[in-house]
Amino acid sequence: DLTAAYTFGSAGPTLSVASLWWAGQGAGDYFNFKSHETAHHFEAGLAYTLPIEKLPLSIAWNFMFAGQDKDENGNQNYSSYVELNFPFTVKGVDLNATCGVLPYDAGITTYGGDVNSGFAVTNVALKATKDIKITDSFSLPIFTQAIWNPRMEDAHLVLGISLRP
């Protein structure tokens, strides 16, 4: 996936454009960008965080404007995804609550082959991050995230570390 993004000012909205490749290895020519042949999804996004210290809610709206996101007649679906994020801290642990939705019917096919027929909650998540002090000069940032997709009746638990220079 390739993404270019620009944030307007220090606290303004962020505009992004992405080329998403979900086809995997051996799925065709990565550099084929022809509308009805490409395996790319081209997506535009707009994100903004409310400038309210006690309510740092962010909202992002992304939609596919070209590429493989087609309906059964070969027309562009303009599939969209809207996500809300709310960061907060409890007892020294940084948390982030997420809720993502498909706002309308755009012919999106789920991994199980079902077509989404309208508004659907597709991402409910809670992520916890904590820096574990190893020495006076080094901390290990660890995280865990519980993710649930009610539309697909699917859940995941992710554990990880972040290494920064």
Language model features by range: what are they?
Residues 1-85, 106-119, 158:
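Outer-membrane pore/translocation modules
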Residues 126-128, 153-165:
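Outer-membrane beta-barrel "beta-signal"
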Residues 7-16, 49-57, 87-97, 129-142, ...:
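Short loop/turn motifs that connect adjacent beta-strands in outer-membrane beta-barrel proteins
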Residues 146-151:
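Short, exposed beta-strand-loop hairpins at the edges of beta-sheets
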Residues 94-135, 139, 143:
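Outer membrane beta-barrel transmembrane domains
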Residues 3, 144-145, 161:
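Flexible domain-boundary/linker segments
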Residues 77-100, 164:
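Repeat-unit-sized solenoid/scaffold elements
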